[in-house]
From Swiss-Prot:
GO terms for cellular component: plasma membrane. InterPro entries: UPF0259 (IPR009627). The lineage of its organism: Bacteria, Pseudomonadati, Pseudomonadota, Gammaproteobacteria, Enterobacterales. This is UPF0259 membrane protein YciC. The keyword Cell inner membrane applies. The chain crosses the membrane at residues 20-40, 87-107, 116-138, 152-172, 185-207, 225-245.
Amino acid sequence: MSITAQSVYRDTGNFFRNQFVTILLVSLLCAFITVVLGHVFSPSDAQLAQLNDGVPVSGSSGLFDLVQNMSPEQQQILLQASAASTFSGLIGNAILAGGVILIIQLVSAGQRVSALRAIGASAPILPKLFILIFLTTLLVQIGIMLVVVPGIIMAILLALAPVMLVQDKMGVFASMRSSMRLTWANIRLVAPAVLSWLLAKTLLLLFASSFAALTPAIGAVLANTLSNLISAVLLIYLFRLYMLIRQ
């Protein structure tokens, strides 16, 4: 059967509209979890204020030089802040991926679904999803740090891994390997969707500072919710595409 991107886009749009409230609630809940965890594990305001003490920002040619000019205590604070942001983001993304994919599965099975039921049903697979998203993020970030293009390629090739992990109950590395093979064979259908997702995420990041005007906490929740909705659309598309490819 011939699969066209237009038909998958149409199916994705219809599902997103029909389940918008549930997907919005999952996105909002995941955003709230991300912000709360980030706040809990982040250094205090007093500690963050120490990062500016005695660090010659104007004389630093880059981030590496800036970190080198910090005291050991400041470097530890920066590491804690970075780890808190990364950890909270990974937790939020894992819950989002599990929740959205379970929504699709439950709706496809003709069952009624709520945000809490979808997240609860995804609980058994969250540890594997967390590891998968961590490894995927690590590979993509390393690729982007090198020449950007390898990172984008990795993001495309690993896009189907979360769907395959949940739908086919694969292991973490098995889903990554299978995703690379299947995506490469269907690159024309996967690449445009992932590139659009990356572009939308980048544009949201550029305007993220404007959300802080609402108060930092509310702005962070709102920005994360919008980011989660963008990711949810991609997950719906990838799930639908994967089911069509398997037929």
